[in-house]
């Protein structure tokens, strides 16, 4: 097992190189050409090999062929569109549903402006952003679970 030499940060030539912005790893090895020519291609090829291996070993199922004469009673979108589908399904007016969907990203865009005086990284020291995140997560889960249920049970999740 080889021992790697740590850089001597008291060396004036090394300090001059670092002051000029010469990129080094934490152990003093220059980023060019070592990282860019050796490490990055290995990581890229390894990622590509993992993706190809997963595609070969576990191919995607195509499902049953479409039959236009045998449609399901209620057509549901993909799982990640359940909350949006539930908003459109539960509101009686289509324009109101579209406005409700448009208000979600607008509300998320406004959160940093509401709490711009608080510069902390800790989420417990940013109560507005934390509250908006928790409320949004709960509402999204509620809408997503409700979309899989019939319309009469969707808003109460069948509990009441």
Swiss-Prot record:
HAMAP family from the UniProt entry: Cytb6_f_subIV (MF_01344)
Entry GO CC: plasma membrane-derived thylakoid membrane
Chief location: membrane
GO BP: photosynthetic electron transport chain
Family: Belongs to the cytochrome b family. PetD subfamily.
Subcellular location: Cellular thylakoid membrane
Coiled coil: none
Upper taxonomic lineage: Bacteria, Bacillati, Cyanobacteriota, Cyanophyceae, Nostocales
GO MF annotation list: electron transporter, transferring electrons within cytochrome b6/f complex of photosystem II activity; electron transporter, transferring electrons within the cyclic electron transport pathway of photosynthesis activity; oxidoreductase activity
Its job: Component of the cytochrome b6-f complex, which mediates electron transfer between photosystem II (PSII) and photosystem I (PSI), cyclic electron flow around PSI, and state transitions.
Organism: Trichormus variabilis (strain ATCC 29413 / PCC 7937)
Gene from which the chain derives: petD
Tagged with keyword Kinase: no
Subunit structure: The 4 large subunits of the cytochrome b6-f complex are cytochrome b6, subunit IV (17 kDa polypeptide, PetD), cytochrome f and the Rieske protein, while the 4 small subunits are PetG, PetL, PetM and PetN. The complex functions as a dimer.
Protein name: Cytochrome b6-f complex subunit 4
Transmembrane region(s): 36-56, 95-115, 131-151
Name of one Pfam family that matches: Cytochrom_B_C
Membrane topology: Multi-pass membrane protein
UniProt cross-references to InterPro entries, sorted A to Z: Cyt_b/b6_C (IPR005798), Cyt_b/b6_C_sf (IPR036150), Cyt_b6/f_cplx_suIV (IPR005870), Cytochrome_b_C_euk/bac (IPR048260)
